[in-house]
């Protein structure tokens, strides 16, 4: 799947999990954003929650390490995770939900600001179907590299994100979660047949 994305023109990849990263790294030459997703009853934070995650990601070939930059509790403080990313020689990407998250991360030395968590935190829950283009515009004012991410689920939304100020766009579930795309096609077909 990673090679297919690169063959299709992807300029980089976002890879979840150490084993996936180890499998993909030797096969592609594009930059890889590495993350580890962890589910825990102790915290709603799921993306790169510990310094040990960071070490494993960088040792496995991640060029960039993304972490949850929201102000929610987690195993290791977000400041410690950022320090670990930088100490391990990787580029830091902050997965943010608000402009405040982005400002704090940018001031702390993060190179890439992502709208990844907009709509996925208690403070930002939304029924919106598309990416948070207003947040992209707000991030652009920080003079940082801006990654539009989250709910970019059709090709027509990617240029909209770029026009709003994104330097780059991450397309996730629309490409990787085939069950969601299949269900969307089935729903449309069934709706027309009824």
Residue spans of the language-model regions?
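Short, electropositive alpha-helical surface patch
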Residues: 34, 87-90, 162-175
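Catalytic cores of alpha/beta
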Residues: 1, 44-57, 97-109, 143, ...
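Catalytic domains of carbohydrate-active enzymes, especially glycoside hydrolases
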Residues: 2-14, 59-61
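Conserved, mostly hydrophobic/aromatic
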Residues: 5, 24, 105, 113, ...
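Active-site-adjacent beta->alpha loops and helix N-cap segments on the catalytic face
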Residues: 14-33, 44-51, 69-86, 98-104, ...
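Hydrophobic faces of well-ordered beta-strands that scaffold small-molecule active sites
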Residues: 13, 32-36, 65-67, 92-95, ...
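A structural motif
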Residues: 9-10, 62, 110, 166
